[in-house]
UniProtKB/Swiss-Prot annotation:
<feature type="transmembrane region" description="Helical; Name=VII">
    <location>
        <begin position="421"/>
        <end position="443"/>
    </location>
</feature>
<comment type="function">
    <text>PsaA and PsaB bind P700, the primary electron donor of photosystem I (PSI), as well as the electron acceptors A0, A1 and FX. PSI is a plastocyanin-ferredoxin oxidoreductase, converting photonic excitation into a charge separation, which transfers an electron from the donor P700 chlorophyll pair to the spectroscopically characterized acceptors A0, A1, FX, FA and FB in turn. Oxidized P700 is reduced on the lumenal side of the thylakoid membrane by plastocyanin.</text>
</comment>
<feature type="transmembrane region" description="Helical; Name=III">
    <location>
        <begin position="183"/>
        <end position="207"/>
    </location>
</feature>
<dbReference type="GO" id="GO:0016168">
    <property type="term" value="F:chlorophyll binding"/>
</dbReference>
<feature type="transmembrane region" description="Helical; Name=V">
    <location>
        <begin position="334"/>
        <end position="357"/>
    </location>
</feature>
<keyword id="KW-0472">Membrane</keyword>
<keyword id="KW-0460">Magnesium</keyword>
<feature type="transmembrane region" description="Helical; Name=XI">
    <location>
        <begin position="712"/>
        <end position="717"/>
    </location>
</feature>
<keyword id="KW-0602">Photosynthesis</keyword>
<keyword id="KW-0793">Thylakoid</keyword>
<feature type="binding site">
    <location>
        <position position="561"/>
    </location>
    <ligand>
        <name>[4Fe-4S] cluster</name>
    </ligand>
</feature>
<dbReference type="InterPro" id="IPR006243">
    <property type="entry name" value="PSI_PsaA"/>
</dbReference>
<keyword id="KW-0249">Electron transport</keyword>
<dbReference type="GO" id="GO:0009535">
    <property type="term" value="C:chloroplast thylakoid membrane"/>
</dbReference>
<keyword id="KW-0004">4Fe-4S</keyword>
<feature type="binding site">
    <location>
        <position position="680"/>
    </location>
    <ligand>
        <name>phylloquinone</name>
    </ligand>
</feature>
<dbReference type="Pfam" id="PF00223">
    <property type="entry name" value="PsaA_PsaB"/>
</dbReference>
Amino acid sequence: LVDRDPVKTSFEEWARPGHFSRTIAKGPETTTWIWNLHADAHDFDSHTSDLEEISRKVFSAHFGQLSIIFLWLSGMYFHGARFSNYEAWLSDPTHIGPSAQVVWPIVGQEILNGDVGGGFRGIQITSGFFQIWRASGITSELQLYCTAIGALVFAGLMLFAGWFHYHKAAPKLAWFQDVESMLNHHLAGLLGLGSLSWAGHQVHVSLPINQFLDAGVDPKEIPLPHEFILNRDLLAQLYPSFAEGATPFFTLNWSKYAEFLTFRGGLDPVTGGLWLTDIAHHHLAIAILFLIAGHMYRTNWGIGHGLKDILEAHKGPFTGQGHKGLYEILTTSWHAQLSLNLAMLGSLTIVVAHHMYSMPPYPYLAIDYGTQLSLFTHHMWIGGFLIVGAAAHAAIFMVRDYDPTTRYNDLLDRVLRHRDAIISHLNWACIFLGFHSFGLYIHNDTMSALGRPQDMFSDTAIQLQPIFAQWVQNTHALAPGATAPGATTSTSLTWGGGDLIAVGGKVALLPIPLGTADFLVHHIHAFTIHVTVLILLKGVLFARSSRLIPDKANLGFRFPCDGPGRGGTCQVSAWDHVFLGLFWMYNAISVVIFHFSWKMQSDVWGSISDQGVVTHITGGNFAQSSITINGWLRDFLWAQASQVIQSYGSSLSAYGLFFLGAHFVWAFSLMFLFSGRGYWQELIESIVWAHNKLKVAPATQPRALSIVQGRAVGVTH
């Protein structure tokens, strides 16, 4: 299944800029060359039309990507080992903040090193690494060093693998298209054995070490990981059933293991994180599911599922040929494959964002509010990018890989044939959502300005309670006992029902109340998401042709206009739809992050007195303030931004500078988005004239950015 030595390793070849393209390799005539070089370097489709060669390049590039990821991880662990207060934080996580970066005293920058507690001065980090390290049982900086070195070794291995599997032993196309085998290995190997080994690590290393840490034992006194693995008596002291070894497993007396494989639900009141015994149980269960799933598909033996059969059998009474032909699409178009994967992974990433705060998985994560906010923001943004990427690659598939002559009356063909109905209805839904959701706010602003609070939509006047959401919350809060035997509490405290959990005088989590304010902003979310989908879906469904430009497929994925003499055909390419979709994705996620930040500070996060009185960070003002646009501007945007803007001269000044810098970058983007190409070309011509006059003109002709290039630079900034 492999070819030996298919491509020779040549440093001379790599050193030649643009070696992958005949035109670019000729060298620059104009400055457009450098843009084309960057645009096409990784567009393997443009290098060759041979699917096997493209597949090999993608496969090899994945190893390069993994190498970079290991390098990054190594850097994170190295910072933890070399520059951090991890051991101090471990001994007192409620009073000491995590820091892994100390700024050198150059031109006064050491002002950034704030006091994070315990006499350590540095920048407080919000990545959540300390919490993960504690959960995985890392007790010393030496262990972090070892892990960092291990990650570097793996980075080197991955780099080697990328070279080896392209230049020395490159898989044949048949190997890339053997989906059943791939599914079996990925499910059973990566997900199954991966989860099983993690569950094993948690049971044998994380659980005992965290038991000791929770009990207040000094990290230096705790036995090292290998001692727990080699010495069963150590574990048996904490979990007596360990003394029996594997006997209960083989005699099916599994309840013996209930000490360390639990099903409690809720949070550990000591750390404010999920019970680590629940997490270990979860990974064991997941491992078993995936190990079974990894044996479902038919390979060398004549048993199991065949993907092609499953897809072709999948048709309903109203859907024509159903999924017939989908198998061929997904095994010959990597763009189509990638599109599906991005859509699913993007959605999953957003689900992760919501679980990180509602079911905080690591010890002391819930009371580290900055980290909670950062993790939510990070996962929302990544999810948004992946979903827009899904639309981008779906459109590239439509333009480059879709063959309309062989597709008839399957689901994709049927969707394309009634795309006008889909898009016009979706457009109507967007208009409806936009006017109504915004209209509710405008109504409230107007009534507020007229001094008529009794006529506003609010929890104290005209109520618009999110009754369905409240019903879902209530159902989950009542679920333990009714549905899940043995579970003492519901999956998340946010559903309601339980008492709040406080750790070190700070609220970890409490039932999150939903009211009129949430109902209003929820419909803004619905509006922005639907508009994003409208733009992206229109780009995909009209990527090959439209009434305006019937031959769009011939123009490619990105083009500025349909040539001279065709007015009104600019910015219609599939690429332009991705460009516009990105802006709406930014829009949508901004509102989500605003909602989350304010809601959590107002109704969840805060301190708790000895008498049990909770004081929230913004004093519970979300319900009454966020129901007007003015409230959002005054009590959220200005109230929070003013603290950042006034941070100059304090250890927080970096955030003020970032805030300022981010707005500069944003303003800079407008220069590219509102620019006329001809204006710049004209300006360049006169600058070139001046250079010629002084006989210092370069051989490479300067060119203004093309329309598409300008928009690319703009949207990036």
